[in-house]
Amino acid sequence: MPDRDHVTVLLPTYDEAATIGDCVDDFRAAGFDDILVMDGGSTDGTQEIAHEHGARVETQSTTGKGEAVREAVREHIDREFVLMADGDGTYLAEQADEMLAPLDEGYEHVIGDRFADMEEGAMTRLNQIGNNLTNWLFSRIHGQPFEDILSGYRAFTRESFMRLTLSADGFGIETEMAVECAKRDIPTAVVPITYLERPAGSNTNLHPIKDGGIIFLELFRRAKTSNPLFYFGSVGFGSGLFGVLLALYVTVEWFVYGVPHQVIAVGSAGSTLLGVQLVMFGVLSDLLLSLHREQLDRIESLAEEHGGDD
């Protein structure tokens, strides 16, 4: 596994005074000497506590976990490997070796699978349903069974992170990273980990409905360039289905009750036609994307061949 001297532990935080001290201590006890706490402007003393326990503390320029991660890696980390965890005490520092080991085996990104060993009470039933639905949807769109794309326990090379196109500000950062890894064929491993219940006295910053909606929208938005057939096809299918249902309603009203609905009939035809066009556009976009990827593969192969000749 990577030498500890080549690893920075990244802990994005916001008002985690109840847990950050023990979290930093655990990673220091695990042998890490560079622990970066990237704080989003905590008002409960998180920064002071982290500093007292030996962490390097930086305040991000704006709010949100996504901004914290991007700013930390791009501006405050220069080591080759990054081990990222939450500062809420739900991840075990003693499992750092399992997280880092795949990076020595050719993988560039590692995701900790919380569902492999989840402590009772660590995740609400609503959050479990949302996580499972997100993971299922991700696998359908991107064809990669990453198991737990919303996990906050990650290990990755700094070089691979710099290749990702990331823009999410909040909790959508994990989804965005997973999508980018799948899109760019970055070798990604999934490692079973233990997920603990939050320590008593600490409060989560996650809002299930609000943040869940943001995550779903981010996942769907990213499908536009990763799987356009799904993106346009799903909208087209919905539009076409709506048009067909309207047509059935108009037909029944006309033949059974003799009531005409000319305006609804026009709307039905328009909705159905739009649906068909969107599906066709999705098929064409998917074809163009496949051709684009083939061209990129050829260019990379030629570059490797010429590089070998040198």
Predicted region positions:
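Acidic metal-phosphate-binding loop of nucleotide-sugar-dependent transferases
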Residues: G89-Y91
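Donor nucleotide-sugar binding loop of glycosyltransferases
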Residues: E16-T19, S42, K65
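Active-site acidic Asp-centered loop
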Residues: G40, L83-G87
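N-proximal low-complexity "stem/linker" segments adjacent to membrane-targeting elements
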Residues: M1-D26
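Short, acidic, metal-binding catalytic loop of nucleotide-sugar glycosyltransferases
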Residues: D25-D34
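A conserved acidic beta->alpha catalytic loop
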Residues: D39-Q47
